[in-house]
Amino acid sequence: MQTVEEFARQVLAGMEDAVPSALASVREQKAFALDAQENVGPNNPDRGDVLDIRTHNTAVSQFLDNLLKLKATLTLMRGGDGMDPEFAAEGLAVPLTDYLWAIEYEKQRIDLFGYVEARGFFDSTYDLACALRTTPELHQALPACKLVVCDELHDINEASFCIIETLLNVHQPYFVGVGDKDQVIYSHLGADDAFLQYRIAASFPDCATFPLSMTYRHGPHLAYAMEAFKNKAVESNLPLRTEIYEAPYADQPGACGQQVVEAVLQWQQDGKPLDACCILFRDQHQSIDIENALMQAQIQYRTLTMHSYLQRDEILFLRGMLAIALGDFHHVASPETRAAIVEALATFAEVPLTPQELSEAKATIARDPATLEYFFEGQIKRVGNPAARARIERAVEYLRGLEPAAPAHAALAAVCEFVEMEKLAQRLYVHPYEASVVTKCVSGFIATARNLNQNLPDFSAWIGTAEKVAGARPGKATVLLDCVANVKGKEFDHVILPFLDQGEFPNPLRTLSEEENLFYVAATRAKSRLTLIPAQDPARRSPFIARMQLAGTLNRANNAVRRNLAVPTATAGRRDLKVAYANKDAVKSLGAQWDRTRKVWYVPDHLDLEPFRNWLAEP
């Protein structure tokens, strides 16, 4: 079992004599990208007036995202096509600088003779797809398989499809593919429902298709709600009533967070484990109100892949401004957070530091917080972007001139005006949607200060305390938090969806079809309970809730549960195992299987338990 990337890496290893260096981490790939960026200006001297070359972390991250998109869609084909770069970049909806940077990146990665120096994330897929497209005689290098099974076809992109299509054409194995067009949510990475809708059928006319209409995750109540929402057949034979609750929140500060807390506490009172409950956000700015409410209720939580709001770049920047103005960095206890604040200050002040200079500054200030003042005086005020550093200097002077009792929220709002935060976000983040999320995060941070009604020193101290809570080592009694886009393929007993409002979900800056798919993914992560938290005002509610037709499908779902309960079921004979990591290969070789959801090894019911006696868990 392999991902397409792993498969491509294996095929290339059999074709190439040398082994390319592996850019195994984001840090290594960013360093490689910065090396390539140095060639963009010299190799494009006639475009110096339109190039926007920046070295800060946000710019490099956005470049790597655009590079991945170009490779996934095979729109950065090797050798170029003679197209004018300005025209090509505009047509591909990427900044000209990033397009030219991508060309230099690939020239640095692969020389004129085809020697590959390095490979990072997705590069094996891209390299193999390019080779198969340009050199048909390489098709025979693909392994001869009798059976090919592909899951998650809704995530497929042009490069991956090229490999799968060639593999099937060359050796003509039996093929089984599984995908759900309603789960296409990664269009920014080249995913497209066209592959499921007609591309596969066009390439393989004899391929039979079957509907994905049965769910084994949740019961009929949620199945029929999703059937109504997506206008497609969905059925569940589980004898399970998946509860769906609506908990509208009032139009007042903290109300949505309070409803989330009540939903979590009710789940706990029902005797359910907190770590089986996950709060899913449309995007990360929504977590601010919820994290604050959980902290206030003393409910421990942990984020899965997203950062706590106190660790996001725009909030770290404001925290850095406060620390400089107050001369108070000791409330930031974590050296890692101090280093992150330095990087955020360098990014938002547009300080042109080399990676080595930035690394040294981060290490120094993480060790000795008092040196933050020297960073402000010696770097931000001296070499930062002239306009940006002037605005930041005025903001710091303003903060230093405030009375100690001045309210923190008013001070932060004034700082955002001084630095022109909305314009700054739009300048740093190319895509309007990403800039809007940054702006909303900042607004949420200011709202937090307003709700606490504290002065600047007290608010700074509160942030330090809150960060310790958010960063505490989680125990088992821990609620989970993440963004919807990060949890596709996962499932949770209880899913809570807050802020189901107009303008939030669906988001007007995204295509409606992909927003529908994202909501579908969010709701269908739930197994036994789904809690929807919309605005109390019907005019502000997300239209997605009405489309679920919860009242209209209720009787049918009740009847289906009764029907499913009446069906006799065989007693499941599978037994869980208690296996140390060192013994996993042993039980696997005996036929044990791994339950990804429950994170436990088990013996299927058709196997004899005797060989597993030493690992049997208590029934």
Residue ranges and their predicted role:
Residues 500-565:
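C-terminal accessory regions
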Residues 1-66:
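Conserved P-loop NTPase-based nucleic-acid remodeling module centered on helicase motor cores
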Residues 205-209, 213-301:
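Helicase P-loop NTPase motor core
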